[in-house]
Amino acid sequence: MTSLDQLNHFLESNPDLEILELLVPDMNGIIRGKRLDVSEAKSLFSKGINFPAATHLLDSSGNVIDGIVLGTDDGDPDVTAKPVDNSLSPIPWLDKPAAQVMITMFDENAEPYANESRNILRNVIKKFEAEDLRATVAVELEFYLIQDKDALSINPRHGPVPGTILQDEGPQVYSMEDLRELDPFFNQLKETCKAQNIPMGTTISEFSRGQFETNLHHVDDPLLAADHAILLRRAVRETAKSFDMGATFMAKPFMETAGSGMHIHISLKNETGDLMFELDTNQGSGFNQNVEHAVGGLAQTMEEGMAIFCPNANSYRRFQPGFFAPITPNWGPNHRNLSIRIPLSDPKNVRIEHRAAGADANPYLVMACVLAGIHQGLVNKVNPPKMISEGEVIDPEITLPVKWDKSLDAFESGSILKQYLGSDYSDLFLRSRRCEMDRFNAQISNKDFEWYLRSI
């Protein structure tokens, strides 16, 4: 079915449609876009639409990065944008009948636009296809709900003590009461995800008040899995607004509570459909060499990947003791204090869980780096670090760059990930992050006044 056929079929089922929103995830994983009248939809689906190429290169505040091509210095040129196949879906939260579609860009030679993070991931996937390997992946995302409009500060949602105006205390991890109180919200979110083809799975109350985790069902297409993650974040935020709440995927929105992560679960099959990751009692780790080499590659590339996994200033506030945040590239089975975990599973479903990224990261770039690490490990037979046993008590030394400037230095000096992401895109990413870091550090916050104004 062509893109135009998909549109016509959708319009037949939704004859009252008035609005079409075009979604463009930028370098930060922030959705930018345009809104069209439905009368313009057929032109979009048949010919495409002009779109500024620099949209993909904005910083987190929507600023154009100084001194790069495809920005203000060269007139902000357009490229052609076209719909992503099978991404057209209804929007239930707007007042008028509306739909959304993801779009992807093409350069003047009709080639996929090189600075689009979806295409960066697509290029890494091609390396697996060249080895006749297929990845099955799923994404878990943690987030906070916010609900206290009368407060002078931003606070996570607290569950009430039933029958009183008092607020419940403690993290209440796995609380069924929290889920019960938010039943209308989660029911609406589930319906929205179903309508938008987002395979939402299990939801739990997480390790802090107002924090929740939702997982996505696994799919055999890493690009589609990243699409699902991007769209889930949008669905959560928009559904929360409908219930007079806010939602945030910031990595560390509150100082004394847990940070929010993005966990990537991945398994591999070869050209005959056989599982690549298996148990092996002949190996000291209990896992076969494919698992060990994949873990070895992930550990080897984690230091230079931290700039991708933790892309902004707030990302690095997540690295505090006691909150399951990664500080060294360790690994082992069934252990949440590790950066690379082998979850408990039956022998036919062995998978690797990558736990380094924050919930604020760009899913396409995170997925690209995770796949790159696994590919690097398998192709070069990289040995993993010493395995941490299940239940082992650890006090790891911080070896990963858990400061923003240090992570950017590690990415710049790294030699592996740039080969997968492309040197040009890597340079643009670095310039974007350094420019945003400089702008952030130049701000005068209230904390400056609270700490220094009176005493200095």
Regions found by a protein language model. Give the residues of each.
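ATP/Mg2+-dependent ligation/transfer catalytic cores
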Residues: 1-202, 224-228, 396-456
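Catalytic-core signal marking the mid-to-C-terminal active-site face
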Residues: 2-4, 238, 245-246, 269-326, ...
